[in-house]
Amino acid sequence: MQKPWVEKYRPQTLSEVVGHHEIIKRLTNYVEKKSMPHLLFSGSPGVGKTTAALALAKDLYGETWRENFLELNSSDERGIDVIRTKVKDFARTKPIGDAPFKVIFLDESDALTSDAQNALRRTMEKYSDICRFVLSCNYPSKIIPPIQSRCAIFRFSPLKTEDLVENLKEISEKENLTLEKGGIDAIIYVSEGDMRKAINVLQTAAAVSDTVTEEIVYKVASKARPDEIKKMTQLALNGKFVESREQLYNLMIDWGMSGEDILIQIFREVPNLDISEKEKVHLVEAIGECDFRIVEGSNERIQLSALLAKMGILE
């Protein structure tokens, strides 16, 4: 069975990692000196945190990286027992070969409970001579200050468009795909700097056709084209409520889009609308209120219809 492309084309060394040049430079220095502090990687999903941690381990240990590297996903194993058993058992044993220390990688560490984080802090202190911890998280504010203060913090930003484009073209060439300009632009739009999402969308589109077009990308990603969102929004702003609501229903039924997805796309379109700054402020406020109501469990169609109605009377 064919591997997912995100694994097939995952960088194996730090030099292969796409983007984040300053971060990679600092990590490479750690490898060269065979010395590093505990690390905290923060950033949104799909921007390279796990890839950087794996590449760091492979560069540090070479062929013995599996014996000296432990990866745990904290969202699955988030309790204090994991810290007391798996983490402590691995941390207390000496490194294999000539490695100066072992590395424990805790993915999604912001999912750890408060008790588990306090136990982790004590473990980090106790075994710091033979073990280093690399923590990754989406929300660093959920990591307790005592752990943050013990780590060198690396903030991974969403990948730049040129980095995404270069990688997508390289993968397309290896997979014998024709990647149209519109297809690239569509993948960039739906992925929002998330390389994992971009590669997954490309692979899904490739299963439909060897020529990746704009239409195919939006269809497999269950996203509306920006011009469709803009058309619906513009109709509402012009007071054509019934027509804009019809466009909304088409998106939800024909494209199978959730209300939350449509709302996010409307929000992304606000800066491009031909309305005053004051009206944009009121519109964003209305979008925020709509989002809150949907999250609380209100009917998506009713709330989005109400938002479109409000657009027609913006002041």
From Swiss-Prot:
InterPro entries tied to this protein = AAA+_ATPase, ATPase_AAA_core, DNA_pol3_clamp-load_cplx_C, DNA_Rep/Repair_Clamp_Loader, P-loop_NTPase, Rep_factor-C_ssu_arc, Rep_factorC_C, RFC_lid
> Record's GO cellular component, any one?
DNA replication factor C complex
Q: Which GO terms describe its molecular function?
A: ATP binding; ATP hydrolysis activity; DNA binding; DNA clamp loader activity
GO BP, sorted A to Z: DNA repair; DNA-templated DNA replication
Which key words tag this protein in UniProt? ATP-binding, DNA replication, Nucleotide-binding
Give one Pfam family. Answer: AAA
- Entry keyword annotation includes Ribosomal protein: no
The record lists ATP as bound by 43-50
| Top-level taxon of origin | Archaea
Indicate yes or no for the key word Nucleus: no
Q: Supply the SMART domains for this chain.
A: AAA
Subunit comment for this entry? Heteromultimer composed of small subunits (RfcS) and large subunits (RfcL).
Q: Which PANTHER family match?
A: REPLICATION FACTOR C / DNA POLYMERASE III GAMMA-TAU SUBUNIT, REPLICATION FACTOR C SUBUNIT 4
This molecule's function is given as:
Part of the RFC clamp loader complex which loads the PCNA sliding clamp onto DNA.
Q: Which family does it belong to?
A: Belongs to the activator 1 small subunits family. RfcS subfamily.
Task: Write down what this protein is called.
Answer: Replication factor C small subunit
Q: Gene name?
A: rfcS
